[in-house]
Every structure is written in C-alpha cells, then in structure tokens.
Amino acid sequence: MKTKIITRRDFLRVAAVSPVAGAIASYQNKSSSKDIAKQPVSQAGTGKIRVVLIRDENALAGFKKPNEEVVDRMLDEAMASLFDVSDPVQAWKDIVGPTDIVGVKSNVWRYLPTTREIEGIIKKRILDAGVSEESVGVDDRGVRRDPLFQKATAIINVRPGRTHDWSGIGGCIKNPIMFSPSPPDYHPDSCADLATLWDHHNLRDRVKLNILLMLSPQFHSTGPHSY
C-alpha cells in the first residue's frame, strides 16, 4: 500500500474534525520506521516526525468517558502502524524495556483529564513490554517532586487536546510544562518560548512517545480556566 504523506497543516485540519480520534507520534532520522525508537528526540532536528492518526466512532462509552476495550484496540493498532510491526507489544518493546524506569506524564485538569482508563491502558502495555510494576509511574503536577520521574529513563507524554487561553492550544508540546520550577515563565508573548522547555530536564532524550487524545477535545474558551 502506498504511503500517504501529510503535512502538519493536513494533520491539524483532520484532527480538528475528528472528535473520536487520537494521534501518536515518535521521531526518526532514518527511512525505516523500525529505527524510530533508536532516535532520541534530541537527534530529530532535521529528521522526520512520524505521526499516526486513528479514529473509531465507538471510542467513547459516554460523555468524556473512554470505551476501554475500543481505545485499547486503537492504541494497539496505532502503535503497530507507527513502528511498522504486527505485534503492538513489540512496538512498546522498541521504546521501553526491563531496565527502564518509565514515567507517564498525564494531565489531570478536572474538566478534561487524560482519564484513569487511558492511563491504565498505557501502563498495561508498558508492563507487557517487560518494565516492572515498581518502575512505572503516572503523574502530572507532581512530576518535579516524584522520585520515579526524577530517575525516569523514558517518558510517555499523553494528554487531551484543547484550546488554551495563553498558548492557543494545549497539546503535547505544552504538557511537560510541570517539569519547570516556574511554569509561568513560559506564558509571556502567547507562550512563544514554550518549545524551549524541551531543551531542559533532559526531555528531548527521555520522551519516547507523544499521544494526543482527541476523544472529546475543547475547541473554544473565553479565559485561562474556562470550559
């Protein structure tokens, strides 16, 4: 099957009209997608970013409540496609393994959180990849104080997509802002320097996977904390 190349503009346009969707991305410098996991983000400046968009009309069991069985299958299909393998567990093994300490950087904003269901689905696959239970943690606002995240060798970055009064959009670039000792430092000029956050806290090397949830995205707000 011929691969279709989409631009960032194409991706954002499709995602904007796909409320029951998710997008996962990793980074590569080589032509083979199987090399993705071997390329840390810090080496991806002039390389390629591989993005998989997946949708299912049954992804929600209710208002803002994920259908775990469906989303579990969606994530498996997306990971297999992203890493060009038939077994989704093998895809996870390409980015984490028994020697890793893995932090899942979630988002707990009460109006539109990542949800415990999604966090559980991701954690299950991390464990399936051979990471021990005590070496997996999930956190958001406490990542700087969390001993596991301080030692984490791999980070899975996951959050819902939503509008944001300062940055325009709250997505995967913004999600690690809680690693900063002073998040407001990134707010001036519509968060113009937000991407520089990734130059600190070893994020470029430690973040192995970005998952943007578009199951119930927020497209409009009237203030910094509105919903």
What is the predicted role of each segment?
Residues M1-Y227:
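N-terminal and secondary-structure boundary signal
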